[in-house]
């Protein structure tokens, strides 16, 4: 499973002063506001942002990759990805993906958020070759808010929140790869889940 190493320790490091005083950590919410995170949400936001950084790294290494879901979990995070025919990600590929993630972190990219009307959201995802995101938009209620987070060249449909800059992600480790059916339905395509 892909996890932030010692996530609880890292979360405390991000929000604790060496003398034990709290240091506020801000997150970017989908309404565009940057607000201080409650302490119990810090680990989740770090993990969620790490999933986006991992997806960006995979997209840089595998430009034809098509992404489905990439949530934070209780133990880390993952992203489900559809790779072109004949292309597979295995644990042998983890060092290259982790190296690209480290580059993205070092670039200190700012997370930004924008809301789009349904037609524009679909057009954006179609233009980027993200068929699973288009299907997800189609499944949303007509009055749903559709927001996208961007860091650098990478854009992902997401409700957030996220860290403000990629440099806030201090440590991570790819730990596994498995298969996962799109939407958890065995009648759908098997995707690659990277943890």
Q: What does each model-found stretch correspond to?
A:
Residues 4, 10, 23-46, 66-69, ...:
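Auxiliary tRNA-acceptor-end handling modules of aminoacyl-tRNA synthetases
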Residues 41-61, 72:
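Active/ligand-binding-proximal structured segments within catalytic/core domains
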